[in-house]
Amino acid sequence: MTLHVLCVGGEDHALRIPFLAALRSRGFRVSAAGTGAALPFSNSGIDYHRYDFNRFGARVADRLAVGQLSQLVRGIRPDVVQTFDTKPNLLAPLAVRGAIPIVRTINGMGWVFSSAQLKALAFRPAYLALQRLAACWTSATVFQNKEDGDFFRRYRLLGNSPAVLIGSSGIDVDAFDTARAQAPSTAQLRRELGLGDDEVVMTVSRLTVQKGIPTLLDAAAIVREARPRVRFVLVGPRESEGPFAVDQALIDRYAPHVIALGARSDVPALLGIANVFAFPTEYREGIPRVLLEAGLAGVPIVATRMPGCGDVVVENCNGHLVPPRDPRALAAAILDLLQHPARAKNMGQRSIALVRREFDLNVVADRYADLYRRLILTGRRSEDPAALSRDIHEDRRVSQHGGKSP
């Protein structure tokens, strides 16, 4: 019998295609449901079903999404439903209501639990209530970092479902290496972007306040006082980010020393021109994929001390961790790596080893496949958490090495 997994996500669900392909190679039938374009899935031979919800609110749209997902599940009858991202994690359990085993992956807690803004604080009680409700129909909850698992336990958001720790959604190491091998030379990319011989600090993220872009811009000004020939390259969408987007006028104020390229599909190639990768997020991340990409590219990393970032970056081992919303600390860490290129290169090499060992897609896919099979074999919505899950307190991070090179 071929087991069928339906994976439900949001607008950037195409990022899960390598994960779905890895499940398919392990004998699963896979389908996907998301709010983005169907073409990437059809090109990969994956059945795709589009549904609608509003990432920025809209209760009416959410109710419609629950109805659409319920109809979809009844129509295709998967054996397991897997969800990623905040709203799908809430909406899909309400749509399925225990009819089929459902696994939700908490890939970060996001802005609501990272910001002290009144709007974020106001959302928190509703978020907690919805998570408790969703837990009633959840078979297992996967966390990408220990901090989020601890949070769900503290606020009793798991119900009777077991908690499982699986670091990240995985990164296809072979595909990443192939993309870099087939990319234009770094010299060509530098010419195309007009960078010359300048040092490059790169950021790949949505260009939002919550991702720390204003902090990065302030840090860029500080860095340039010490090293005038440094360029900051921002890669990622802005226009699609609604009320959270950074004002374009703010970015323009720092031109030409700050360049915003928009969303790009050639991130593996672009990372080849970076001397330092900066990730100033104020967000509660799961395991940020961009940190895995930067690590696999061998670029030394400066990230904020937020959940998820410390699972990839170990202070003075493969990069630096700094407080969020602190441009001076961010600038100092960037300058340290630029001023000590040999040490920075060694840090990058440690990141390569860490990502290949801990976050390879094959490692992650094996763990999910094992979880799905055990859920289905029980014939129940969930089983004894002690029998099903690996303890959420299992910490497979590089910090087990005591801050030494992995």
Predicted regions and their residues:
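Conserved acidic donor-binding segment of nucleotide-sugar-dependent glycosyltransferases
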Residues: 314-316, 320-327, 336-342
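Glycosyltransferase donor-sugar binding loop
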Residues: 33-38, 171, 204, 231-245
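Nucleotide-activated donor-binding/catalytic signature segment of Leloir-type glycosyltransferases, i.e.
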Residues: 245-264
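Short His-centered aromatic/hydrophobic patch
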Residues: 83-89, 106
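Conserved donor-binding/catalytic core segment of Leloir-type glycosyltransferases
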Residues: 195-211, 217-220, 233
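Acidic donor-binding loop of glycosyltransferase active sites
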Residues: 272-286, 299
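Donor nucleotide-sugar binding/catalytic pocket of nucleotide-sugar-dependent glycosyltransferases
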Residues: 49, 128, 132-184, 195, ...
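Short hydrophobic beta-strand element within catalytic cores of glycosyltransferases
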Residues: 291, 300-303, 313
